[in-house]
């Protein structure tokens, strides 16, 4: 735990080290940006007409899309004097660091899941069989793996993750064949499938999708573009800010994280530079073939 000597605040580097591993990077591609407008690029194979040569013809298209970088802000009402008193008493500031990082990560992850579910293709509802919760968990575990295989048939990319809301997360993680990843809300099945918890879901559902790592390139339904203001630190997407409480005139401290969420152009007629309004991804509902969402009857 480090503390800034200049203002008594938790060192922002410490906040970032706590923050970045909590973000659901298992379900999104990452293309960092240094600009206030995040631009992402993608290649797409395009079949061409048969020219009679006996060779299957394929071309490639480069797509470019962009979105405005937005901000997540989190402030603490704890005053500088309180922080200094905590230090004098030997109380660790890690409580504040963890709280700020956890809450910002939570807000970013909520945005990621909401955007992903908005653009995913809606599949047929699933009904679980079994007389016990354990049997239902086993049935759901089988069904999400079948859904992952179905994605491979249409895209060539096998599903790598499932986002689970409501009771579905408990069923999947309670079936005895998963292990938690670090301190995050992510588990990994023995099969390699990542299981991500949508803890704010108001219904039972699963979204199965692809995040495929191809070295320098990644394939997924959604692109997460963190704004890297500090190139000296990996994952430097957050910075401190200082304001003033209008009522007490006391200093107010907090952290701002800046990032963008974008999706690739999903229609063949979307060419050139396509602007994505990530605050209204519902306009692209039911359009991504790299992720499918299913309502679940438990």
From Swiss-Prot:
Per its UniProt record, what InterPro entries does this chain match? CAPSP, Gp23/Gp24_T4-like
Q: Does the record bear Ribosomal protein in its keywords?
A: no
What superkingdom does the record give? Viruses
Keyword list (alphabetical) reads: Capsid protein, Late protein, Virion
Record's GO cellular component terms: viral capsid
Pfam family name, one? Gp23
The job of this chain, per UniProt, is described as: Capsid protein that self-associates to form pentons, building the capsid in association with hexamers of the major capsid protein and one dodecamer of the portal protein.
* Record text on subunit structure and interactions: Homopentamer. Interacts with the portal protein. Interacts with the major capsid protein that forms hexamers.
State the protein's name: Capsid vertex protein
Query: What is the originating organism of this protein?
Result: Vibrio phage KVP40 (isolate Vibrio parahaemolyticus/Japan/Matsuzaki/1991)
């Amino acid at each position: 735990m480090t503390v800034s000597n200049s203002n008594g605040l938790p060192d922002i580097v410490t906040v970032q080290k706590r923050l970045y591993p909590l973000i659901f990077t298992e379900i999104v591609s990452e293309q960092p940006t240094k600009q206030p407008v995040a631009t992402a690029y993608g290649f797409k194979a395009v079949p061409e007409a048969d020219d009679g040569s006996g060779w299957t013809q394929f071309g490639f298209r480069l797509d470019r899309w962009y979105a405005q970088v937005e901000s997540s802000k989190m402030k603490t009402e704890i005053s500088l004097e309180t922080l200094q008193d905590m230090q004098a008493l030997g109380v660790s500031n890690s409580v504040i660091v963890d709280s700020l990082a956890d809450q910002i990560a939570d807000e970013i992850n909520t945005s990621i899941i909401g955007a992903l579910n908005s653009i995913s293709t809606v599949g047929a509802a699933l009904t679980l069989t079994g007389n016990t919760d354990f049997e239902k968990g086993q049935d759901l575990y089988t069904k999400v793996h079948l859904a992952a295989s179905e994605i491979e048939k249409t895209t060539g990319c096998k599903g790598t993750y499932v986002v689970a809301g409501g009771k579905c997360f408990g069923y999947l993680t309670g079936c005895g064949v998963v292990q938690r990843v670090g301190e995050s809300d992510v588990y990994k099945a023995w099969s390699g499938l990542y299981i991500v918890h949508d803890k704010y879901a108001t219904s039972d559902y699963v979204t199965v999708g692809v995040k495929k790592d191809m070295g320098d390139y990644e394939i997924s339904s959604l692109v997460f573009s963190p704004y890297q203001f500090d190139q000296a630190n990996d994952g430097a997407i957050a910075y401190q800010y200082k304001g003033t409480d209008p009522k007490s005139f006391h200093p107010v401290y907090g952290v701002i994280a800046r990032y963008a969420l974008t999706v690739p152009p999903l229609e063949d007629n979307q060419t050139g530079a396509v602007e994505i309004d990530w605050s209204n991804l519902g306009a692209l509902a039911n359009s991504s073939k790299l992720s499918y969402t299913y309502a679940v009857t438990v």
